[in-house]
Amino acid sequence: MSVEITFVEQFQEILQNGKEQIILLNFYAPWAAPCKQMNQVFDQFAKDTKNAVFLKIEAEKFSDIAESFDVNAVPLFVLIHGAKVLARISGANPQKLKAAIDEYIQPLISQISSTNASVETQVNSVQTTNTTSNTSKAPNGLDSELNERLSTLTNAHNVMLFLKGTPSEPACGFSRKLVGLLREQNVQYGFFNILADDSVRQGLKVFSDWPTFPQLYIKGEFVGGLDIVSEMIENGELQEMLPN
């Protein structure tokens, strides 16, 4: 069955706990006729698909979440697995949505469920991948050069904020709120506008294993997004982590 998101913390918790799961996001508007039709289709697909999470998100009500996934029109469906966006399906098109489920969800479910796969098969698969790729890969799967660049960026300052826009002109609500929190705490930090470099933007999702922005790093270690940082400020953890 599908789950209706009713508060931001619920969404963040599902993302945090569902890194190994396949998640399909349905951004909709209750007043739009195409969304009403696709909500019914979405609910039916949710009933028919096991071992995947189907989330419905009212785009205008949760504009910050919508902005973090670059939602410009509804209905929009975003398929994610871990930190990777697998597919985006725009508009009222049940056939395309079903095709994406068949292409991405079903194979991944089979892969996750195949606990009896032989070691030999896994080794052969890795060998095949390695022989067909001339690009050096980091352990997280990123291109080695990009991974090294991200490591350098995240260590550029003791505290680094990766956001949409700049601290003076944030380009999304989440970024604006986190900038405000850091200012209230008198935190000195460096920043990087991920809208200016898509390779950094997409790479950080894998590097941090976190699919949304903003992202805060302290001494090169990923701390979290807006909700996690907010909680850490409330319980005093953030101040303890900050360099003297």
UniProtKB/Swiss-Prot annotation:
PROSITE patterns named among the record's database cross-references: GLUTAREDOXIN_2, THIOREDOXIN_2
Glutaredoxin domain location: 147-244
Coiled-coil residue spans: none
Keyword terms of this UniProt record: 2Fe-2S, Cytoplasm, Iron, Iron-sulfur, Metal-binding, Nucleus, Redox-active center
GO-annotated cellular components: cytoplasm; cytosol; nucleus
Primary location: cytoplasm
Pfam families: Glutaredoxin, Thioredoxin
Compartment(s): Cytoplasm; Nucleus
InterPro entries: Glutaredoxin (IPR002109), GRX_PICOT-like (IPR033658), Monothiol_GRX-rel (IPR004480), Thioredoxin-like_sf (IPR036249), Thioredoxin_domain (IPR013766)
Binding, [2Fe-2S] cluster: C172
Residue intervals of the Thioredoxin domain: 2-106
Source domain of life: Eukaryota
One MF annotation (Gene Ontology) recorded for this entry: metal ion binding
GO-annotated biological processes: intracellular iron ion homeostasis; positive regulation of transcription by RNA polymerase II
Family: Belongs to the glutaredoxin family. Monothiol subfamily.
NCBIfam families with a match to the protein in the record: Grx4 family monothiol glutaredoxin (TIGR00365)
Listed name of the protein: Monothiol glutaredoxin-4
Organism: Schizosaccharomyces pombe (strain 972 / ATCC 24843)
